[in-house]
Each structure stands twice: as structure tokens, then as C-alpha cells.
């Protein structure tokens, strides 16, 4: 490579590649020269590479030549958002396409009798496949291309399919042969060969999805490739002739139940179609399907960008987009239906801990450890299962990556319509589920919907979620008055509140404070519902209505009405003291406690970073801990990236990218060992137990302050500045990994033609820098010990890594409410028993417990105490003001209170009521007295809960923003671990 050209690459590597700043036309001559040199090199090398050492040098030299001469140019082109190139450039890229296919076809490493030492390296194969993939993208056929371009492109696409399919056949056949071989002396050789075949197969699978997508659109219709693929997805389809967005595609597909109209493969089956079925069959793999789906919509959106047709992306025009109706239904309705069915089966298989251990209850702090032998499906395992296995989760992560690519190219006009179409089909299916099915609702609203928000909140310009449809479902669950359904609804409202539009928020506030006020605070007997509703009111509703002229005073008036009603009934409240003076006061310390010993504790959230997870998975292959233990753990994480061990999931990339990603993750993890050690299920400094005393609870929460500031190493993988050197501070393992990466650019002294472009290795150490610029994303590689002609060798990084990389750094959750267990006080149990006796409730005591008569002296004692209390009331009057809870109105700020008349409930004066019959009057009086006591008790509890929640809010607002908080716990069946709901 000449100095001028080399400097040109260096400049492109460090500057932002604008849409017009990079021209492939400038590299036409360079690409032709590189092509000729590569052909000469591989022809000469085939004669000399006769041993392992020479073959290794050949593979490394070939890999580096392709990286620096071809792959760098292709990556720059794909990153420049250009969609057209000259005929000459198309010709040279087509020649490269044929050459790479011939090079891969000439490889005999997949033959069972080929020595492993003489096989092409996996790394060289990955470089070739990425070059092929990039060429396919650059040469994509769009509306302005000629029919000649279409024919050439289609022909080479067919050659690629044959090449990849033949390799898949060889891998499958030889793998079976090797597994059947039981000879001990060949065992180690066979194992190595099998490992090689598995790695090769993994590379091909990463490319198959994209290859299927391009073949779906660009192979001639006579091959019926699109029909074969759609039949693999769903066999119950029919076809008809109709005009399409793609002028050369005439067939429209739709679902049918008519056996006579269904497509039969026998009608068009031939030698080619049988061959296509092999590569199409891989669509059944989730990752291959998502890769196909990514490129399927990429081709459509690119085509629409330059099309003169009026076809848009909406339900009424799906017939003009080939296969869209079939594929959309499959990945939305069928995916979610399959996910929920599998999830329900798993939940139903959960053993009942009460049967396994009668002496341990679910609220026991050590419940998990005491019942570990029962293999309970914990909340952590459920969340990990959902985010690891749900196809719906994979779908929306795929759409998020595609959105990042399309927005980079500055044509989002059809993108929102495409996303809205997927969301509307999802809503259509959700609307068919009963509002009483809280298990499905919890998965959909608190996992799937929340995951969609997490994925797209880093792209605020995209507004495609139809909030009105979602909150209509939430309100339907509130109307059921089922505790589990209401819990799911309130949880979702709290967590999604900041993302809902202002208009929809106001509508929700009106409905909650008008239609559901009495239902949620008085008619509901579950403390959890009261606590969650108060959290929604204090943390979300009150701050959001401060600027609303019509709703500003509504929450204030509601709380004020409660307090005034309490004041009116103050005398009756005093009369209640003679029965149990602690009934009301006890709620001040336990206002936020539910299920006896459970509480939602506010603690800082420590991000469970992708880099840390990638390092753990690659460092420990037998890792058994959950990768996604909670919903908040995926707030800044891409599950598919983790499941692919840090690799890009939707296309084939050079293996060096994976090595660099792992080394970067390791470096970040090792530089923050203390912080990473503190990460436990995504939380930092959480407490498992706390005292019943309120002061200890407050002090415990203050100890869990969130550590401010983030390390500079939390920058994305697209800003790599990772320097690997062998210093005295590095461990031996780090040296070996750095040397391994350094050897990727090892210099072959026997090939003089490549000496000018391959950096040499220093005898003392290796200093390599792989660098992605903040804007250009360019990956730089140079040897600092020996600089060739004082120029650096540049390798541009793959632009795919930036498509969804913002998710890693977009940490929208700073604090969470986590379920914790508090120490159970024996007095609480006694109070529960007293309350049960007082109201005549039959509780689940020992089956041998016999009710005993009350002693006569105890009856006399109670009567005497009542008389003394009545006399004391006469003397002291209303001197018990300290017993009445007063709402904390400070949260409303300087709210101008409306002096409106509040409907007041006065004491019922029984003497003024003219009711005949002494016994009837007495019974009626007792009933009214009990009603009033119950009402007053509920108001006191509500005010205490409100005040306790306000204290939490002030503690939170003093440190962080109002919308950076998240409630993170699981709604489970009452017989399962970590349950937050009980059935009465």
C-alpha cells in the first residue's frame, strides 16, 4: 500500500465518517490491486504451506491482509450511510465476492481426512465471511439499480448459498462420523476435530440468517425460495398474484384454513428446492430467525427509502410487502403465545413449600436456604428464564438494534410505523387475555413491556408506544378487585409513569383519584395494595400534577378530606381507646409492612453491566448463577449479547472483535474489583433484615447511599482505548491474553510482499491499541515499538457494535424498592390473635387447640376497666390529640388550599333516632359503632401510610431525581418462594 493511500486510511480512521465524506470510488484502484495481490499470494502459499508453522503464518498473513486491504474499506462504506456506487466499483466488489467464495470452496479443512494442522483457521474464515457479508450489504439492489445489476447480484447470491450449504452438509456428515468413532488412540484427535467443526458451524450460523433474508428477496421467483422459507415458518399458507413493493416479486402470501388452497411443496419441488431446504431449516433456531428478521426489515426500509411507490408500513398495505403478514403474526402473536404457555407450565410445576416443610413459612427470612432441597423456582430463576428464553424478548432486542442502524442513516420516516405495527399486534393479542389472569399480566406488563421501554428509552425520538391501550388494560385489572391483579397494575403504573405522555398521565390521575379512590383505600383489605397505591400517589402523581391547573389540587383535597373526616369523629376515636389504645398507634411503625414481616426497602441500584457479565461468562464456563435475576438487571443490558458471550447477534463479524471485547471486559472488571464484588443481583448495599423500630429502618436506608460517579471505563465498546502491555503490574494470565491478541498481527518474514503492511512484534513486549473513535468508531492498531515508515496500520471497527450500544450507558434507574424481610416481633403475633378474637375471626391455629370459656374474674375485670376508662374520658374530655395522625402536607408545597366545604361524617347520636324497640336500638347502635370504628381505623392507617411514604419520598428526592426509582419484585403464586401476595 502506498504512503498516500495509507495516510488516507489513517485519516478516515480518526475522523467522523460523514455521509458524503467517504467515497468508495476513490478506492477502486486500490481494491483491484489488493485483489490481484491476494490471488497471487494464495496461489503461491498453497504450494509452500506444507506444515503447521507455515500454515499458521499463512492464515495470519491472509487474515491481516484482508482486514487492512478489504475489510476496513467495506466497514467504512457501511458506516457512511451511502447506498450507491459506480459500475466499476460494483464490478471490483463482485470480483472480490467470487474470489472469496472460491477461496472458501478450495478449503479442504472440513474433510474428515484433512489434518487439523493444515486447516484454515477459524479466524481467517470469520474474516472472509464478514467480507462477504459486507459486500452483500453494499451491493444491495434498490429501485434505481438496473436489471443487469439484479441478475449479477442474484447469481452471486445463489453461489454463496451453494457454498455455505455444502459446508453445512460436510460439517453435519463428518461430525456424525467422528462421534461414532470409539477408538481410544484417535479420541483426542477426534475431539479436536469436533471442536473445530463446531466452531466452523457456529460461524456459518451467524451468517445464515442474513443470507436467507437476502435470498428471500433477490433470488428469482422460479426458485421458490421465499415460499420454502414461509412454509418452514407456517405450513398453513396460500399464495396469490398481486403487485408488490418489489417489482420482480408477484406472489402474495396469507394464512388459510382451507386445505384446498394451501401450498403444496410437491407442486414445485425440484433439485434446487431440496437443496434450499437445508439452509432454510436453520430458521427454526431463534438466533438465526432473529438475524433473518433484522435483515428482512433492513432491506424493506432501505428499499422504501428510494422507492417512488406510495406503499407504507401499516396493516392495510401488508399485502404489498412479501411475506410480511406471515412473519409479523409469527414473531408477535405466536411468539408471545408460545412464551406464555411454556411459562405457565413451569409455574404450575413449582412444588408447594408448605407440603415440603410444614415448619417453615414463606415469610421466613431463611426460607430459600431451608427449602433449597426442594428445587423451588425462585423469582431470580423466573426472571432469568424470561429474559434468556422468551422469543418476544429476543424480538424487541432485535428491533432495537435495527432502529439504531436506521436512525444512523437519518431516514426514520418508516421506522416508527414498523415499530408501531409490531406493538399494535402485540396489544391485539394481549387484549384477548382475561384481566383476572395475573400470571400472564405480570409477564406482559412488568417484564415484556418494561423491557421494551428499557430498550428504547435511549432513543427518545421514537414515539411508537400506544399508552392508552396499555393503561386501559391496567385499569381493567384494577376493576377486578383481585389482589394479585391490582398488584400487577399498580407496579406497572409506578414503573412506567415517567414514559407515559402528559395527556395520558392526566387521564390516569383523574380515573385513579375519582373512580378507584374508595376501591383502593377503603374497600381493599390488603396492606400491599394500600402501600403500592400510596407510592404511586406520592412518588408519581403528586409531582406530575404540580403544573396542571385542573389536577393540581385533587390529591391534596383527597388527603384533606380524610383528615377532616377523622377530626369530625374525634370523640368516637377517644371511645375506641377503652377497647385497645394501641390499635391505631401501632401502625405508625408498621405502616409500610405487609404480610407480617415484609417491606419494600429503598436501596441504591448498582448496574449489572454487560462487561461484567461477559467477563463472568467467559471466565467461568460452568457459571450457574442467574444472569438476569431481576427486571431492573436488564435496564442497561442486552440479553442477546450476553447469551452470545459478547458477540454481535445479527451478523457475522471477525473473531478479533470478540477477543477485543472480552479483553476490554476483563480490564474493566479487574480495574473495579471492589465495585463488582458488591454487586449482588444488581443491588448495592441492600439489607436482608431490619429491626421493627422505625429509627433503625431509616438509619439502615441511609447507610445504602449510592456511590456517585462512574468510571471512565464505562464508555461503550465503540470507544475502545484498550492498551495491552506486559508490565510488572500485570498478571501472567493477562500477559498471555495480550500476547494472543498481539499474535493476531504476527509478521510473516517469508512473505516479503506483505511486510510493508503487517506490524512487527517487539522482542520485549507488545503494545497494541484497538481504538474506536467517539464519532467514527474507528479501530486503530499499531506497533509502538517499531513504526513502519512512521505510519500506523489502521483497522476500522465494525459499525454494528454501535447500533444499540447506548443501552449500556443509559442507566435510568438509580434507586429501587426491594423486598426485604424484617425481624418479627412476638407482640405483633399477639396483636393479630387479639384482633381475631375481638372481631370473631376464625384463624388457622393448631388443630388441637380447643376454645376455653373465659374465667368469671376476667369478665369482671374487663367490665371494671371499661367503667374506669369511661370516667377518665369524662374528666379529660378530648385530651388525646397526640393520638390522631396528621397528614404531612409539606409534599404539596405552597399549595393554595381551596376553602371548599368538605362532606363530613358526624357522630351518629343514637338517642335522637326514634326507633322503637330497645333491643333493636341496641343492636343497631353496636353495628353503627363498629362501622365507624372500622372507618376511623382505616383512615388512621391510610394517613400513617401516606406520611411514611412521604418520608421515603423526601429521603429519595434529597439525593436523586424523582423519576429514577423502580419497584423491583416478583408477583408470584402464594405457594412459591419470595411471594409478596397471600390469599385469604
From Swiss-Prot:
An MF annotation (GO) of this entry: MAP-kinase scaffold activity
Disulfide bonds: none
Superkingdom of origin: Eukaryota
Gene Ontology terms: biological process: osmosensory signaling pathway via Sho1 osmosensor
Comp. bias intervals (Acidic residues): 687-698
Region annotation (Disordered) ranges: 675-712
Disruption phenotype: Cells are viable and do not display any phenotype.
InterPro entries (alphabetical): UPF0592
Family statement drawn from the similarity comment of this UniProt entry: Belongs to the UPF0592 family.
Protein name per UniProt: UPF0592 protein YDL073W
Lineage, uppermost ranks: Eukaryota, Fungi, Dikarya, Ascomycota, Saccharomycotina
Amino acid at each position: 500500500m502506498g504512503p498516500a493511500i495509507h495516510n488516507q486510511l489513517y485519516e478516515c480512521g480518526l475522523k467522523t465518517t460523514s455521509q458524503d465524506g467517504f467515497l468508495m470510488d476513490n478506492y477502486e484502484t486500490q481494491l483491484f490491486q489488493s485483489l490481484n495481490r491476494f490471488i497471487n499470494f494464495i496461489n503461491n502459499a498453497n504450494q509452500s504451506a506444507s506444515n503447521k508453522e507455515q500454515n499458521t503464518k499463512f492464515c495470519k498473513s491472509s487474515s491481516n491482509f484482508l482486514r487492512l486491504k478489504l475489510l476496513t474499506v467495506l466497514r467504512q462504506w457501511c458506516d457512511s450511510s451511502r447506498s450507491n456506487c459506480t459500475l466499476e466499483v460494483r464490478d471490483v466488489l463482485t470480483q472480490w465476492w467470487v474470489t472469496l467464495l472460491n477461496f472458501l470452496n478450495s478449503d479442504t479443512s472440513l474433510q474428515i481426512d484433512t489434518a487439523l494442522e493444515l486447516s484454515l483457521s477459524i479466524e481467517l474464515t470469520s474474516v472472509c465471511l464478514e467480507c462477504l457479508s459486507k459486500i452483500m450489504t453494499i451491493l444491495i439492489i434498490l429501485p434505481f439499480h438496473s436489471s443487469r445489476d439484479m441478475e449479477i447480484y442474484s447469481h452471486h447470491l445463489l453461489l454463496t448459498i451453494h457454498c455455505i450449504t455444502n459446508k453445512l452438509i460436510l460439517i453435519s456428515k463428518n461430525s456424525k462420523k467422528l462421534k461414532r468413532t470409539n477408538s481410544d488412540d484417535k479420541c483426542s484427535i477426534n475431539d479436536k476435530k469436533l471442536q473445530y467443526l463446531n466452531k466452523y458451524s457456529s460461524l456459518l450460523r451467524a451468517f445464515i440468517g442474513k443470507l436467507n433474508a437476502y435470498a428471500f428477496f433477490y433470488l428469482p421467483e422460479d426458485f421458490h425460495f421465499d415460499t420454502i422459507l414461509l412454509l418452514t415458518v407456517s405450513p398453513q399458507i396460500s399464495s396469490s398474484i398481486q403487485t408488490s413493493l418489489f417489482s420482480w416479486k408477484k406472489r402474495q402470501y396469507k394464512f388459510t384454513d382451507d386445505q384446498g388452497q394451501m401450498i403444496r411443496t410437491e407442486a414445485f419441488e425440484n433439485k434446487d428446492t431440496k437443496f434450499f431446504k437445508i439452509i432454510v431449516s436453520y430458521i427454526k433456531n431463534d438466533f438465526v430467525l432473529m438475524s433473518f428478521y433484522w435483515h428482512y426489515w433492513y432491506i424493506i426500509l432501505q428499499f422504501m427509502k428510494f422507492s417512488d411507490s406510495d406503499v407504507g408500513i401499516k396493516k392495510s398495505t401488508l399485502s404489498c410487502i412479501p411475506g410480511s403478514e406471515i412473519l409479523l403474526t409469527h414473531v408477535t402473536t405466536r411468539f408471545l403465545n408460545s412464551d406464555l404457555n411454556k411459562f405457565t407450565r413451569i409455574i404450575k410445576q413449582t412444588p408447594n413449600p408448605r407440603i415440603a416443610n410444614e415448619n417453615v413459612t414463606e415469610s421466613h427470612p431463611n426460607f430459600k436456604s431451608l427449602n433449597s432441597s426442594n428445587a423451588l423456582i425462585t423469582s431470580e430463576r423466573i426472571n432469568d428464564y424470561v429474559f434468556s428464553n422468551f422469543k418476544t424478548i429476543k424480538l424487541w432486542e432485535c428491533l432495537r438494534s435495527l432502529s439504531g442502524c436506521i436512525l444512523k442513516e437519518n431516514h426514520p420516516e418508516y421506522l416508527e410505523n414498523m415499530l408501531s405495527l409490531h406493538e399494535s399486534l402485540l396489544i391485539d393479542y394481549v387484549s384477548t387475555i382475561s384481566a383476572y389472569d395475573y400470571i400472564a399480566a405480570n409477564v406482559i406488563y412488568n417484564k415484556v413491556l418494561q423491557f421494551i421501554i428499557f430498550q428504547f428509552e435511549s432513543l427518545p425520538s421514537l414515539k411508537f408506544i400506544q399508552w392508552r391501550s396499555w393503561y386501559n388494560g391496567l385499569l381493567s385489572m384494577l376493576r377486578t378487585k383481585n389482589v394479585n391483579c391490582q398488584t400487577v397494575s399498580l407496579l406497572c403504573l409506578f414503573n412506567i409513569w415517567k414514559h407515559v405522555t402528559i395527556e395520558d398521565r392526566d387521564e390516569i390521575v383523574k380515573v385513579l383519584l375519582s373512580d378507584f379512590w374508595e376501591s383502593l383505600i377503603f374497600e381493599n383489605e390488603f396492606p400491599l395494595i394500600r402501600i403500592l397505591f400510596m407510592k404511586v400517589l406520592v412518588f408519581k402523581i403528586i409531582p406530575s400534577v404540580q403544573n396542571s391547573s385542573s389536577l393540581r389540587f385533587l390529591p391534596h383535597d383527597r388527603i384533606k378530606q380524610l383528615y377532616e373526616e377523622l377530626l369530625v369523629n374525634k370523640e368516637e376515636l377517644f371511645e375506641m381507646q377503652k377497647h385497645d389504645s394501641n390499635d391505631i398507634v401501632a401502625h405508625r411503625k408498621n405502616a409500610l409492612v405487609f404480610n407480617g414481616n415484609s417491606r419494600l426497602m429503598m436501596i441504591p441500584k448498582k448496574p449489572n453491566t454487560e462487561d461484567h457479565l461477559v467477563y463472568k461468562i467467559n471466565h467461568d464456563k460452568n457459571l450457574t448463577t442467574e444472569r438476569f435475576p431481576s427486571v431492573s438487571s436488564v435496564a442497561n443490558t442486552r440479553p442477546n449479547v450476553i447469551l452470545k458471550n459478547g458477540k454481535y447477534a445479527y451478523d457475522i463479524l471477525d473473531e478479533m472483535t470478540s477477543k477485543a471485547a472480552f479483553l476490554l471486559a476483563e480490564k474493566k472488571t479487574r480495574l473495579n474489583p471492589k465495585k463488582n464484588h458488591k454487586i449482588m443481583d444488581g443491588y448495592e448495599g441492600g439489607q436482608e433484615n431490619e429491626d421493627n423500630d422505625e429509627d433503625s429502618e431509616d438509619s439502615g436506608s441511609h447507610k445504602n447511599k449510592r456511590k456517585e460517579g462512574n468510571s471512565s471505563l464505562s464508555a461503550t465498546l465503540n470507544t475502545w482505548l484498550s492498551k495491552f502491555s506486559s508490565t510488572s503490574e500485570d498478571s501472567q494470565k493477562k500477559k498471555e491474553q495480550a500476547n494472543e491478541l498481539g499474535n493476531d498481527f504476527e509478521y510473516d518474514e517469508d512473505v516479503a510482499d506483505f511486510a510493508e503492511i503487517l506490524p512487527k512484534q517487539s522482542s520485549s513486549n507488545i503494545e497494541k491499541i484497538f481504538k474506536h473513535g467517539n464519532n467514527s468508531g474507528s479501530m486503530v492498531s499499531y506497533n509502538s515499538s517499531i513504526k513502519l515508515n512512521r505510519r500506523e496500520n489502521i483497522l476500522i471497527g465494525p459499525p454494528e457494535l454501535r447500533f444499540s450500544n447506548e443501552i449500556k450507558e443509559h442507566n435510568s434507574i438509580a434507586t429501587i424498592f426491594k423486598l426485604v424481610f424484617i425481624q418479627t416481633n412476638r407482640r405483633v403475633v399477639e396483636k393479630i390473635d387479639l384482633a381475631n378474637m375481638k372481631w370473631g375471626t376464625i384463624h388457622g391455629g393448631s388443630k388441637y387447640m380447643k376454645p376455653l370459656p373465659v374465667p368469671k374474674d376476667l369478665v369482671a375485670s374487663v367490665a371494671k376497666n371499661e367503667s374506669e376508662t369511661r370516667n377518665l374520658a369524662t374528666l379529660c374530655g378530648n385530651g388525646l390529640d397526640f393520638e390522631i395522625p396528621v397528614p404531612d402536607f409539606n409534599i404539596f408545597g405552597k399549595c393554595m388550599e381551596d376553602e371548599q366545604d368538605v362532606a363530613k361524617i358526624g357522630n351518629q347520636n343514637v338517642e335522637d333516632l326514634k326507633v322503637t324497640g330497645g333491643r333493636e336500638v341496641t343492636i343497631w347502635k353496636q353495628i353503627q359503632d363498629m362501622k365507624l370504628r372500622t372507618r376511623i381505623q382505616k383512615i388512621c392507617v391510610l394517613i400513617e401510610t401516606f406520611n411514611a411514604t412521604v418520608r421515603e419520598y423526601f429521603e429519595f428526592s434529597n439525593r436523586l431525581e424523582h423519576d429514577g426509582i423502580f419497584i423491583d419484585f416478583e408477583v408470584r403464586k402464594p405457594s412459591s418462594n419470595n411471594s409478596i401476595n397471600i390469599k385469604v
